[in-house]
Amino acid sequence: MKLQKPKGTQDILPAESAKWQYVEGFAREIFKRYNYAEVRTPIFEHYEVISRSVGDTTDIVTKEMYDFYDKGDRHITLRPEGTAPVVRSYVENKLFAPEVQKPSKFYYMGPMFRYERPQAGRLRQFHQIGVECFGSSNPATDVETIAMAAHFLKEIGIQGVKLHLNTLGNPESRAAYRQALIDYLTPLKETLSKDSQRRLEENPLRVLDSKEKEDKVAVENAPSILDFLDEESQTHFDAVRQMLENLGVDYIIDTNMVRGLDYYNHTIFEFITEIEGNDLTVCAGGRYDGLVAYFGGPETAGFGFGLGVERLLLILEKQGVTLPIENALDVYIAVLGEGANAKALELVQALRQQGFKAERDYLNRKLKAQFKSADVFVAKTLITLGESEVESGQVTVKNNQTREEVQVSLETISQNFSEIFEKLGFYTQ
């Protein structure tokens, strides 16, 4: 048997992982500015944590979850999304307690799992970056969180992004709209796709965002949620729209957008960009004021979003955006002869302990091959260390770009390479 990675997964090799590290680090920096702190939850949860919160009738639960019974006969699932685990953690760890500052702001990053057909930007093990804010029902929280997502996408370089905005209202508004939608779609049931016929019985709002052609035709004249908002829901949505306009964040009202998870209420949103004629959602989220109470906590407002790292990187690649990744070595040490082996190890360690990114040859190769390695590593400086240099205690340090050289002692390199580095035209941080 040929051992290969499972279908729908990928190996993220060094050339790619540098991009991942950049995106993750960039997200952390943006989130810190908004006073978010990281939370890390298990990659598997009890099945009910996901099924009951996401919705028993959603595609995630009915078709896509990786679930199994462990050796203790506990029903376990690999997490398919990030919000439910964070809410579970919030409640279990009593972060709703009065002594915890509100709103409580958390971000997470990590792998998620869904059994679906693998395609570009969508894998069975995928990675998500997300945020969750607990304790504020203020529409300004909706807008701040959406603005933070827009801030991140703009600064990382995603182009042509459009914000699609909708509201699902409060539970009363949503229930009234749900019934109106059932009344509208029931006479059209036979024209719907098989999936949407099932959705009509279980979760009729999901018919609205079906990608099937026949479903799109059926919902063209469907009633709008905006016509079923009560005063509270209308006031909240009006405030969100006004504050987005105040911040200069453009948006499109999309009344057919409902999101795929059952826990949303009031504001929902997606950031969408067009790639090769297809609309791709790069970031999405919304408000979920009932989820904390559903998990056994007190009534607590919530708002958050998630974005897929694979899809984000795919869009950046398709748009020709080059991330500013620094892969260059500061120093490469070419080693000549067995007599220089031990000293080369001492020297490279001393450089690393001073904060320099350094490498040396370990393979006793000819100098030409070692110099080629220095070029592959884009080494800024090059030191050639042979037995004669070890004996004399003096060595040449070369700027590998300009070929400028300086003669220095091994002791100086070991104790203060910064001075030499700067003399050759480079700057230390």
Curated annotation (Swiss-Prot):
Catalyzed reactions per annotation: tRNA(His) + L-histidine + ATP = L-histidyl-tRNA(His) + AMP + diphosphate + H(+)
One GO cellular component term: cytoplasm
EC number: 6.1.1.21
GO BP terms in the entry: histidyl-tRNA aminoacylation
First and last residue of the signal peptide: none
CDD domains from the UniProt entry: HisRS-like_core, HisRS_anticodon
GO MF: ATP binding; catalytic activity, acting on a protein; histidine-tRNA ligase activity; transferase activity
Domain of life according to the entry: Bacteria
Keyword terms of this UniProt record: Aminoacyl-tRNA synthetase, ATP-binding, Cytoplasm, Ligase, Nucleotide-binding, Protein biosynthesis
Localization terms from the record: Cytoplasm
Pfam families reported in the protein's UniProt record: HGTP_anticodon, tRNA-synt_His
PANTHER family assigned to the protein according to its UniProt record, in alphabetical order: HISTIDINE--TRNA LIGASE, MITOCHONDRIAL-RELATED (PTHR43707:SF1), HISTIDYL-TRNA SYNTHETASE (PTHR43707)
Family in the record: Belongs to the class-II aminoacyl-tRNA synthetase family.
Subunit structure: Homodimer.
Protein name (Swiss-Prot/TrEMBL): Histidine--tRNA ligase
Record organism: Streptococcus pneumoniae (strain Hungary19A-6)
Gene name, Swiss-Prot/TrEMBL: hisS
